[in-house]
UniProtKB/Swiss-Prot annotation:
Keywords: Ribonucleoprotein, Ribosomal protein, RNA-binding, rRNA-binding. One of the primary rRNA binding proteins, it binds directly near the 3'-end of the 23S rRNA, where it nucleates assembly of the 50S subunit. InterPro entries: Ribosomal_uL3 (IPR000597), Ribosomal_uL3_bac/org-type (IPR019927), Ribosomal_uL3_CS (IPR019926), Transl_B-barrel_sf (IPR009000). This is Large ribosomal subunit protein uL3. The keyword Ribosomal protein applies. Part of the 50S ribosomal subunit. Forms a cluster with proteins L14 and L19. PROSITE patterns: RIBOSOMAL_L3. PANTHER family: 50S RIBOSOMAL PROTEIN L3, LARGE RIBOSOMAL SUBUNIT PROTEIN UL3C. Belongs to the universal ribosomal protein uL3 family. Coiled coil: none annotated. One of its GO terms (cellular component) is cytosolic large ribosomal subunit. The gene is rplC. It comes from Chlamydia caviae (strain ATCC VR-813 / DSM 19441 / 03DC25 / GPIC). One of its GO terms (biological process) is translation.
């Protein structure tokens, strides 16, 4: 069951650590608090087996909740134990695994103790509106005097046949702020006391952003 779970954490930044062979390794630091089961969905009533997990618990007065939440949200909150979370995520589980979970169960980094590699998903850094040279690495035009353009894409069309530009060509547009998954990152260290996970290499998003950690899909066994 543990191998199917995903955990929500926060990217804290990057540091360097020495591995067993004395090599200096760049690592991403992820803080992972308690992930609490707030809802259980089963195939007989919901059409599939899954659990909803909450993280980043928030202390909110009851009167404030009644003002800011509608009745369906308040009803869901009462069923889950009246605990408010800043993050909610649904995780699919098998039929056997769903029977091992109860409402209110808490999971942390101990889920990853026997795992050597993980997949990490997050939202990439937003770069705003960018041209084709930054966004796609286009060469651009001649840099010399007399050139009609320097940083444009160049020709993207043809002659009278077909007489149009094909859709899907690379154009200037918004760059970043997309869901990105980095696969098969090596787990360097798990500190259960400080609730910190170190993985080798970079992960998506800026410091302070939310990432989802799961067992690597490329892991053997």
């Amino acid at each position: 069951m543990r191998s199917q779970l995903s955990l929500m954490g926060k990217k804290e930044g990057m540091i360097h650590v020495f591995d067993k062979d004395g090599n200096l390794v760049a690592c991403s630091v992820i803080s992972v608090g308690s992930n609490v089961v707030t809802q259980i969905k089963v195939d007989s009533t919901d059409g599939y087996n899954a659990i909803q997990m909450g993280a980043n618990e928030i202390n909110v007065p009851e009167k404030t909740l009644e003002k800011r939440m509608n009745k369906p949200e308040l009803g869901h909150l009462k069923k889950s134990g009246s605990r408010v979370f800043g993050l909610l995520k649904e995780v699919r589980l098998s039929e056997d695994a769903i029977n091992e979970v109860s409402l209110g169960n808490e999971f942390g980094l101990e889920v990853l103790e026997d795992i050597s590699s993980v997949d990490i998903s997050g939202v990439s850094k937003g770069k705003g509106f960018q041209g084709v040279m930054k966004r796609f690495g286009f060469r651009g035009g001649p840099k010399t005097h007399g050139s009609g353009f320097h940083r444009h894409a160049g020709s993207i069309g043809m002659r009278s046949t077909p007489g149009r530009c094909f859709p899907g060509s690379k154009r200037p547009s918004h760059m970043g702020t997309v869901n990105v998954t980095v696969k098969n990152l090596e787990v360097v260290k798990i500190d259960l006391e400080k609730k910190v996970l170190l993985v080798k290499g970079a992960i998506p998003g800026p410091r302070g952003s939310v990432v989802v950690i799961r067992r690597s899909s490329r892991a053997k066994g």
